[in-house]
Amino acid sequence: MKEFPKNYNFIESEKKWQKIWQEKQIYAYDENIAKDETFVVDTPPPTVSGQLHIGHVYSYTQTDFIVRFQRMMGKNIFYPMGFDDNGLPTERLVEKQRQVKAYNMGREELINICNEVVASEEEKFRSLFNQIALSVDWNLEYQTISPLSRKISQMSFLDLVKKGEVYRNNQPILWDPVDGTALAQADIEDKEKTSFMNYITFKTEANDEFTIATTRPELLPACVAVFYHPDDKRYQHLAGKFAVTPLFNVKVPLLADPLVQQDKGTGLVMCCTFGDQTDITWWKTHNLPLNTIITKKGTIDFPHEIGIDGLKIKEARAKIIDILKEQELFVKQEEITQTVKCAERSGAPLEVLTVPQWFVKTISHKDELLKRANELNWHPKNMKIRLDNWINAISWDWCISRQRYFGVPFPVWYSKRIGEEGKILYADISQLPVDPLKDLPIGYSKYEVEPDLDVMDTWATSSVSPQLSTWGISDEFAVNKDRHGKLFPMDLRPQAHEIIRTWAFYTILKAHLHQNTLPWKNIMVSGWCLAEDRSKMSKSKGNVLVPEKLLEQYGSDVIRYWSANSKLGADTAYSEDVMKNGKRLVNKLWNAAKFVSQHFDKLSDEDKKTNLIDVKEKITHEFDQWIINKLVELVNNATNELQNYEYANAMHLTEKFFWSVFCDNYLEISKTRAYDEENKNPSGQYSSVLTLYHVMQTLLKLFAPFMPHITEELYQILYSENSIHIKGNWINYGNLNYKIDAKQPERLLEILDHVRKFKAEKNLSIKAEVQLLEVSGIELSKELTSDLKNVTSAKEVKFKPTNDEIKVSILT
């Protein structure tokens, strides 16, 4: 055993061990070990455009608890770290940091700047993840924009093309006019906004007036029909007739459709191409003409004497209303609250435009995906309903093309050869990764093709995050077929609950389409980290906690302790009180270890090296045997909780045992025997010290997944020069159990509680001498009575046998 330092300096210790773990490759994956002995993690690649905050620490450490446990259980761990550095989020970061606009820059210039920025941001993440002791193997690091990732992402696309699961079509899509790109259904959020319902006068061909209500009068030039509900008796007389639009005098059909809400507005609604998804449905169902007036920039494209051409949406709306009023065609306006579909990132209200895009078939697979969700092991189980609800709500195929620059390009060109104009040309697998702006399809010159200018949705690459690590998509499309087969499907996907509808869903979809399987066996879903007042952290509120400051103040182990105190999947508020409890626990571990260590030289070197099971006969004292039984019970329960991903329960059980059973009671009761200054009870002393030795060692191992630095420091001082975190270093006591009457030691604790309470009430020191301790009830054994005398400082203990509950009288 090394000399025990006077104090614990967490800053020095944490830096020291982080360096040693890296140098000694404690967390390295061994590719030569069989698949069934390996635990494979699909680590969330953080979006490097995001601000580093305490939420990163919160969620990533919860994964690390499970990984460290699995490693100590003997598993070969595949625990990579990736960085999601491609796509629109990175472009927006660059625009903000460099005060530029992507559409004002050359494509190549923007890409170069993006690469510079992400390299800098990734280094910040690496530093933080090392500081909080994530036990990842950094040799497995990947970036979603790297050549290898681009190759695998393009393989995914080509595999889906070959399977007929991808198509390109010129159809209505959701468009963000601020970021200038198409979006998928999962990229939008519904926002409640104040708006106005405008009542406008229409006429029939016969000059009969009627009123429609709309929130978007600027779309009048795009009106292609007017609808009413077939059961609405007010308007059944309009069947087969035509309406004439105000201001523009365009004849449009009056049609019946069950999607009309009779109690909304007047029950008559105009269909424009396009205001919302209902317009798309009507356009398709009734084979209506396409009349597009909104541009990609969110302005009106409608040269007309009315003068709205080139105006922004809101400007055009105001002008149309003014003109309707002038011509006495405006009936009234009502303020309403409506749900508006907005872009999740820019926040802009979306438009529906008809622009050619790439799509992954999704709607046709909804039933299959619901079955996949059932096959998956959810931790916690109640998170599954979120995926079920999302799948049931899907109404669009997944649009995977984006009109941006910094992303994975489509391996696609369009032929300009005579006779095959517009033919889609795909790259050969041998060419990947390709940039169609620089590369050419086999057999074609640059004059014969037009490159696809779009890039893939960042989720199109993130959705194959398992495959980015396994280096393959399928048997046919793989960089390393053996590696892919060995690692896929994976064991665990950890992630936050708000991206179930995106990352979880898309990854399940891709694995299902590529290999007809789940991507992983288990999904572990974390909640949000909230501010102390339980509000969501945001820069605008000024309540975002910066991890670096907390690490300086408390250290990594304390922050990890706070994270471990949150139930899986629960939103948890940051708590100074919990942090202080964590600091107190670190100090108590140090002091408890320091206390027990002074006795370890009383043990033989052989017994120190021997497993508890093989020296169990040397633990002879009844109270020592009792705590060993309790310890075995703790190990079994904590192991079971960790195997079920309930790390918080495991932490709670271990901490409760450490404080209540070990520190408050066992140490106090057994320390007189451990000292045995008069050498009255050598066997009792040896039994006590051997018990202290193994209980402390076991507790360090139980705490190790949660608090890796303090446990490593103490373990190497007290027990071994090998890391506590090495593979196979978990505790296994098998069926170890001492045949004792557990009621006797527990009775001792109950009596001790009475004595402590008495002394506290009398303002006596806990060590104050007791002349006579008289106890009614069942008599304790000789061994336990001796312990009772020692811990209560009683000169004499008498028992009065009765069947009543314990009563204690004390004479001081």
From Swiss-Prot:
Statement: the UniProt record of this protein carries the keyword rRNA-binding: no
Motif ('KMSKS' region): 536-540
Span of the annotated motif 'HIGH' region: 46-56
Compartmental location: Cytoplasm
EC id: 6.1.1.9
GO cellular component, one term: cytosol
Leading EC class: ligase
Annotated GO biological process: valyl-tRNA aminoacylation
Coarse class of the protein's main subcellular location: cytoplasm
UniProt entry tagged with the keyword Ribonucleoprotein: no
An example molecular function term from Gene Ontology annotations: aminoacyl-tRNA deacylase activity
Residues that hold ATP according to the record: 539
Catalytic activity of the protein: tRNA(Val) + L-valine + ATP = L-valyl-tRNA(Val) + AMP + diphosphate
Keywords carried by this UniProt record: Aminoacyl-tRNA synthetase, ATP-binding, Cytoplasm, Ligase, Nucleotide-binding, Protein biosynthesis
Assembly: Monomer.
Entry remark concerning the domains of this protein: ValRS has two distinct active sites: one for aminoacylation and one for editing. The misactivated threonine is translocated from the active site to the editing site.
Entry similarity comment: Belongs to the class-I aminoacyl-tRNA synthetase family. ValS type 2 subfamily.
Protein task: Catalyzes the attachment of valine to tRNA(Val). As ValRS can inadvertently accommodate and process structurally similar amino acids such as threonine, to avoid such errors, it has a 'posttransfer' editing activity that hydrolyzes mischarged Thr-tRNA(Val) in a tRNA-dependent manner.
Descriptive protein name: Valine--tRNA ligase
Native species: Rickettsia bellii (strain OSU 85-389)
